[in-house]
Amino acid sequence: KAIGETISFPSFEDLVEWRKALPTQCMLVSGTFDAMGVVPVAIKGKEAPGEVSASKAYLAHREQPGILIIDIDYKNEDEVAGLYLGGQQPYETHNAALEALRAVLPELDGCALMIGWSTSSNLFNKAGNQVKGTGGIRIYIPVTDASKIPMLLEVMHKRSWLHGEGWGFVAVGGNFEERSL
């Protein structure tokens, strides 16, 4: 079984240092579990008593300091039935993503943040050959009240589309999926 842990950091800088040292098999999720400390994590819908899943049923954005995680994942043409932008990925560099983010959310000027490649990016096999290149970007932004993260994400989504930073794709099942910063 996997384990989940809710951790509190004295500062954003402490979180950044911790994140940089995190092994690749670990991931950060948006929101926190009810209690601090370690908890067993199961697949959504298969939780036993005392277990949680990394789902909205167990993770919440609480009224406390937290981290807004912006996850910009790309879709390959073979993953979708159709891709808006003619298959072009919206941001190929960290600077391009930050420039777009600052246009959408100018309130971020002067704000601390951390940016890096998604864990699905730059993957290599045991022989050292790259099997996947850039697959997405993650941006971490400290907030004073994490309960406002869902509202902030909605504002960012709307502003993204207004600033030309929205895109979409037709999923294999035929539904249209909107994406933005």
How should these model regions be labeled?
Residues W161-L181:
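Flexible helix-coil linker/hinge segments at domain or subdomain boundaries
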Residues K1-I137, I141-H163:
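Signature for HUH/AEP ssDNA processing cores
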